[in-house]
């Protein structure tokens, strides 16, 4: 089976490696052009580009797939299928029609739930019990195509967006190999999505990560896990921005105000919420490093009665 692979970040690189190691014939890799990144804003290759070069797979980095020249190059290869994983470019209808079996997408949710840009974060923030990978036949809609294969797993209580990403990336690689094997054997049965059950995973906005202490502790804990590693759930303490990276829910009824510090010692910084409380275990001051509660308190002693608050001063 002759394959074109299109993807850009680590999530896609995991899938590319799984396909390559399974012995499938990858004719070409498409990935985004090198982009400026880091403090020096130097051009950096995508994880998919780096991997393709390691395996000596032919590589193209077009700015767009709308170009007739690019489309002609793809047609000339006569691919059986194109795999798309977090590529970042729109696939015109002309490109979708090029492979014999069309284009198939690796999507990090259980479609039709969480179509769109941020399925991992939305599943966490909404408190979903499970998530997974859907392999989808691409059409012109936004994640609306028929599902070819779906695999689910439970979201663990301490999962973050980072840990879920890694689990889903590994599962995505396994699922695309399974899909290609079934496709080669003509054993796939497409299942149309139920549009009435669909919901949209909008792109994450930094403003969403500001903690509202009047919410219950379960929701705030989900926020902290959802926005780890990006952009980091944040609050204000003594007028300074603080990011919270890890916390535990404390089930306790208390008359303290939301955001009020109940206790602060080496075991954690316990803060009252709209319902119950949170023990903050890892936090970060603006311009500083991530610190345990004990490390933070050694340099910034806190007393019961002090408050974390909402802020409009911006982000870390």
Curated annotation (Swiss-Prot):
The EC number(s) attached to this protein equal: 2.1.2.9
**Superkingdom:** Bacteria
Keyword Transferase in record: yes
Q: Per the record, GO CC terms?
A: cytosol
Write one Gene Ontology MF term. methionyl-tRNA formyltransferase activity
The chemistry this enzyme catalyses reads:
L-methionyl-tRNA(fMet) + (6R)-10-formyltetrahydrofolate = N-formyl-L-methionyl-tRNA(fMet) + (6S)-5,6,7,8-tetrahydrofolate + H(+)
Keywords per UniProt: Protein biosynthesis, Transferase
Task: Give the enzyme class.
Answer: transferase
Annotated residues that bind (6S)-5,6,7,8-tetrahydrofolate are located at: 109-112
Q: What does this protein do, in the record's words?
A: Attaches a formyl group to the free amino group of methionyl-tRNA(fMet). The formyl group appears to play a dual role in the initiator identity of N-formylmethionyl-tRNA by promoting its recognition by IF2 and preventing the misappropriation of this tRNA by the elongation apparatus.
PANTHER family per record? METHIONYL-TRNA FORMYLTRANSFERASE (PTHR11138), METHIONYL-TRNA FORMYLTRANSFERASE, MITOCHONDRIAL (PTHR11138:SF5)
Q: Which family does it belong to?
A: Belongs to the Fmt family.
Q: What is this protein called?
A: Methionyl-tRNA formyltransferase
State the encoding gene. fmt
